[in-house]
From Swiss-Prot:
The name this protein goes by in its record: Small membrane A-kinase anchor protein
Function description: Binds to type I regulatory subunits of protein kinase A and may anchor/target them to the plasma membrane.
Organism of origin: Danio rerio
Residue spans of biased composition, Basic and acidic residues class: 17-29
Region Disordered, annotated ranges: 1-29
Source taxonomy: Eukaryota, Metazoa, Chordata, Craniata, Vertebrata
Amino acid sequence: MGCMKSKRRDPTQNSDSSEKVDGKPGKHGEKAVLVFSEIGSMEDSVRINPVLLDYAQRLSEEIVARAVQQWAEVDSRYSDIPYIECDVP
């Protein structure tokens, strides 16, 4: 199951029909639609290539490692700058 957003305006659509999850009105012209996966997903998972899964796992680990390294470098570069709170609301 997933969620897709559509920013197209439908002239026949009510302007009150776009609501957020918390019940507050959302932006006009946006609509969330649930998308259900197919019933036979267990059969599809058997056909996944293990080499492809291994590659995807290594790639995702590399991306996370690079992101953590980049965060650590930026954090160490700017850690000596004090945080100044603003008194103006």
